[in-house]
Amino acid sequence: MPGRCQLYLAAPAAFPPDFAARLAAVLDAAPVACLRLPALPEAAEFLRFAQARDIAALLDGNAELAQRLGADGVHLTDGAEFAAARRLLGDQAIVGVHCGSSRHAAMLAADAGADYVAVDADLELVAWWAEVMVVPVVVELGDNIARAAEFAAAGADFVLAGAPIFNDPAGAPAAAAKLAAEIA
């Protein structure tokens, strides 16, 4: 039986001037388990912001910068970088790997010790993963945000949303709260 699915939030690739206020409003409106930030030096402010709220804060694709800024870990898009990231960040850091829609890549990442595997919005893959594997699976929703509840029901541990939340006409806080309620 699937467990409770949680919200994993992806920040925009560049921080707009009002991002601190927008992020605060989202984090106050919805239970966010993890925040992925672009690998930019300015991410330090938002790392601390999330960590002060007990939200894991990861950098996207740069383990060295993640270590330097004090991030909780790193999200990788290439499983070949996993071993180096783990050595650099240590066993206490979160190291997740995006695997697309490849079962094989996901199994390799899990076998290597990834803390989570992130997959594309592939319902069959998520259901299979939830049934046979123990490593948490993150579904990268992309524009499939309306299908989040389906992925949660299929066994996703986390759903990742970014632009559809921050660009929602109803406002990012309302969009995040709605998504969190749909997947709980």
Give residue ranges: language-model regions.
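Short, ordered loop/turn segments at secondary-structure junctions
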Residues: 62-63, 79, 121-122, 164
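Catalytic-face loop-and-helix region of soluble metabolic enzyme cores
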Residues: 127-143
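Conserved N-terminal beta1-alpha1 strand-loop-helix module at the mouth
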Residues: 1-75, 88-101, 107-115, 134-135, ...
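C-terminal binding/interaction regions
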Residues: 158-159
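Generic structural marker for isolated residues within well-ordered, non-membrane alpha-helices
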Residues: 23, 82, 126
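Gly/Pro- and small hydrophobic-enriched strand-loop and loop-to-helix capping segments
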Residues: 71-82, 120-121
